[in-house]
A protein has these predicted regions:
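C-terminal "post-core" interaction segments
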Residues: 209-210, 218-225, 229-230, 237, ...
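Flexible, low-complexity junctional segments that flank or bridge functional domains
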Residues: 9-237, 426-460
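Active-site-proximal loop/turn and secondary-structure-junction residues that shape catalytic pockets
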Residues: 188, 244-246
Length: 460
């Protein structure tokens, strides 16, 4: 959600040493819209009772805007974030990256501080694609410097224009260098989240397979086209692969749910819950009447610990209406969403020209039509199987382990063994947290745009 935050420009405050405009923007935005506002003492309304005490409070952070933001977050919050450049934030929400095209996962080598990276998939037409880098490739170092828990962010930063990676391979219980290196160059790329869509025909079943890596509104037409193909092909079963999908726009999740079904148009898909002072903004999201309707009464979702936010909304929102079978790992457990909060200076959408900060704080909780939203520990998979870095397989091929397990669960492939039907592989290498933020956001209701104007900074 893009949110209009109205700063009080006539009442800009100062510590006497520097202007506190950004700090004021951060505090006011969280005070008004943060989901856990009433449980954070420093976000209490009485912080506004005295301009002097308020200014003294803000100035103690010494212009460290991230520190102020983080100090105002609830212990329950794993997902809010702030950026100094709102253009970068907008690009991130639209899956526009400065990248070589390698979409990677980091993992720890044994019990050491050393890390290695393995390639999950490669973006088409990227530099990595032209250098023949493929899913399953491993590397230990960047620019001949070993990846560690302390340096990986710097070495893999989007600010780095070009770099080299040194390939590695699994050797017993560790990772060993191969001596091969490749140079890569980054470019700005918008990822098409529809990574694969194809028809799988097995044992008289016509199965639509969609690997979908982000709920991005820019590609809604392409998503509809993919489902139109499924409908024309007469698919009677559906697999939605969300293993790498960290979320995105709520409106796209509603559109996808509506195309998967079609028989529930106008019924409640999800319900939002805001903080107490914004409870009037709680609303129901309804299934849409889409042109493409597969009318499924059961779907299979490939999931992982990186399946988050709008992905979980899709699963949870559909569950009261159809059977949703999860194959893979339990999901992230992000049952909350956010608005993009900017420092607007008027009703026309003009932003404060004196800074470029913007926030993506948690502002709402979202439940399904039955009011269920309590899955902070993730939605549990029905058939558990972790990706094995030593046996990743080729995405979209029926012998790729997670897709194969899904086809077994559907009954169109015989199970390889009884034991494997509910089996969780013990990983040899500990995965590190994802490099991408889990995101669920939506557009601004018009009635929210003027809320802050009546809550000006009080004077002594």
């Amino acid at each position: 959600m893009v949110f209009m935050f109205m700063s009080c420009k006539d009442d800009n405050i100062s510590s006497g040493q520097y202007d506190l405009e950004v700090e004021d923007f951060i505090w006011r935005g969280l005070n008004s819209y943060y989901y856990w506002q009433n449980s954070v003492p420093d976000l209490a309304d009485n912080r506004l009772d005295s301009q002097k005490s308020y200014a003294n409070y803000l100035s103690q952070f010494n212009a460290n805007h991230e520190l102020l933001f983080e100090s105002l977050l609830s212990d329950k919050d794993r997902f809010s974030w702030i950026m100094s450049d709102y253009t970068a934030l907008e690009k991130q929400l639209s899956r526009i990256y400065k990248t070589s095209g390698m979409m990677i996962q980091l993992a720890r080598v044994g019990q050491s501080e050393d890390l290695f990276a393995f390639v999950r998939y490669v973006l088409p037409d990227s530099d990595a694609a032209t250098k023949n880098i493929v899913r399953g490739d491993l590397f230990l170092s960047v620019n001949n410097e070993q990846l560690t828990v302390d340096n990986f962010r710097e070495l893999l930063s989007s600010e780095v224009e070009s770099f080299s990676i040194q390939f590695a391979q699994i050797s017993g219980q560790t990772i060993a260098p191969t001596g091969v290196s490749v140079d890569l160059v980054k470019a700005e790329i918008q990822e098409n989240p529809i990574h694969i869509h194809k028809l799988i025909e097995l044992n008289n079943a016509k199965i639509g397979y969609l690997m979908y890596n982000g709920f991005v509104a820019d590609f809604d037409n392409e998503l509809e086209s993919a489902f139109a193909e499924f409908q024309t092909q007469g698919v009677n079963q559906l697999i939605v692969d969300l293993r790498y999908n960290r979320g995105g726009r709520i409106s796209t999740a509603i559109k996808l749910a509506s195309m998967i079904t079609g028989q529930f148009s106008g019924e409640v898909f999800a319900q939002t819950q805001h903080n107490d002072q914004l409870s009037s903004l709680n609303e129901d999201y309804l299934f849409e009447a889409t042109a493409v309707q597969l009318k499924m009464d059961r779907i299979y979702v490939i999931s992982s610990a990186d399946t988050a936010s709008a992905s979980e909304l899709l699963i949870n929102g559909l569950s009261p209406y159809i059977d949703v079978i999860l194959v893979g790992d339990d999901t992230t457990g992000k049952n909350v969403g956010s608005y993009s909060i900017y420092d607007w200076i008027d009703d026309e959408g003009n932003r404060n020209p004196r800074h470029t900060w913007a926030m993506q704080p948690i502002t709402l909780k979202i439940a399904n039509s039955e009011g269920f939203a309590d899955f902070e520990n993730g939605l549990q998979s029905d058939y558990r199987l972790l990706e094995d870095v030593a046996n990743l397989g080729i995405l979209g091929e029926i012998d790729e382990p997670l897709l194969e397990k899904t086809l077994e669960a559907m009954g169109v492939l015989p199970p390889k063994s009884k034991k494997n039907q509910l089996f969780r592989l013990k990983p040899r290498f500990e995965k590190m947290p994802s490099l991408q933020d889990a995101i669920m956001h939506t557009e601004i209701p018009t009635k929210m745009r003027r809320i802050r104007q009546t809550k000006d900074l009080a004077h002594e």
